[in-house]
Amino acid sequence: MQEKKEEDLQQVLNNVSEVGIDEVGRGSIFGPVFSAVVELTEKNKFTLKKLGVTDSKKLTPKKRKLLLPKILLLSSDYGIGQSSAREIDKLGIRVATELSMIRALKKLKKKPSELLVDGPLLLRPWKGTQKNIESGDSKFISIASASIVAKVSRDNLMVRLERKYSGYLIFKNKGYGTREHLSLIKKNGITKLHRKSFLKKSNLI
């Protein structure tokens, strides 16, 4: 009888899934905004929590890189999407972020029955059930995992883009508007991957 209960519990832990989505790069002034969605069973949520998965902003770059392959291995499914700087300038950051999320969701094998979205805003194009959770990346392992996948994926792209767009220390600032980055824009001008709509607000172009 006890063995049967344990088998039933294991079945629940293996079958019940949580799907979380998060974005990174929303406030950057260079390059795309990235989104990632991750599906996890209850069992694998516990495993990742023990390994130290939490909000990507609370982890060192080294820790995020170490956790990424573990998340991908233990996820039932995942997807990554992005929207370019041009799309951000054309559509606005909220719509472009939503577009990157939808692109990530389209890479899943099946539509989730419920989606956990980090932050207070609805994912307006999504027709399924969703829950918005402020600071969700600190509360739900699926969202935290998505934040790590998105962050490492985008950071890796920034390092690669440094080879083509040198002179802005993109590998270091990851496209964010640090004082050093803004100073280099004044010195070298802007590239086609800089978000013009963001820079106009700062009177940099």
UniProtKB/Swiss-Prot annotation:
Protein name, per record: Ribonuclease HII
Free-text comment on the cofactor: Manganese or magnesium. Binds 1 divalent metal ion per monomer in the absence of substrate. May bind a second metal ion after substrate binding.
PROSITE patterns, A to Z: RNASE_H_2
Family: Belongs to the RNase HII family.
HAMAP family named in the record: RNase_HII_B
Domain of life: Bacteria
Lineage, opening ranks: Bacteria, Bacillati, Cyanobacteriota, Cyanophyceae, Synechococcales
Signal peptide limits: none
Main EC class the enzyme belongs to: hydrolase
